[in-house]
Amino acid sequence: MIVRERPDSYIIIRQHDHGQLSGRFAVYWAESPRPFERTIYAITNHDLGWQFLDRSVRWDETSGKPYSFTNYPTDPKLRAYKEGLRLLRNPYATCLCSMHYASFMQGSEDAAEVQFREMEFRRQEKLKGRMSAEELENLEHNFRLLQLCDNLSLFVCLNEPGSNEHPWYKNGFSFEGKKFEPVWEDRGTLRLDPNPFSRPFDLTVPYGAIQRDGRFRESGYLELRVTS
């Protein structure tokens, strides 16, 4: 669950919906990844396993706030990662998403996270051994593209429309030596400077709003135009 806090409520966005938004950024990236379909599939479905956790809002009894993906309890989160990898339909996407999940555990000394990381490293080596030359040659590039598109989608989900207040993105985005700055033209129109996209496109992501006492307030769609 992605949680954006407001003075009187919380905006919640399901992880898999955010993942599909990531895929939209990847589809319109001007330098199309190779192999295209398998990479887009991986980026679009990189949070597939979260759909089971996101069926309901889980509350942190200590803070009195909903758990988000940043502080969700470790054991169910790791189970969601494993389930997401099981559900992916092709080995290339599985490898990319495994690399993505394992990167979250870098430097961790938590026993469960270390075990998960090492297990995924072994999985990745097996999958690499079955890849074509094109798949293997572009694997690291496509992994970095997944990370970038993940962050672009999180930027949209974590910030109020028209703002750049979340601390993760104050300095923009970096990708393979290039820097991209997010620029809001208005509350419903976003561009990156310099422009990395092949053409303008639209984004739509469903959201819910809950009051601080947990009562449902509303649901709707965040709609956004990305210009080029």
Spans of model-derived segments:
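Divalent metal-dependent catalytic cores for phosphoryl transfer on phosphate-bearing substrates
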Residues: 3-13, 24, 36-159
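Surface-exposed helix-capping loop/turn segments at secondary-structure junctions
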Residues: 31-35
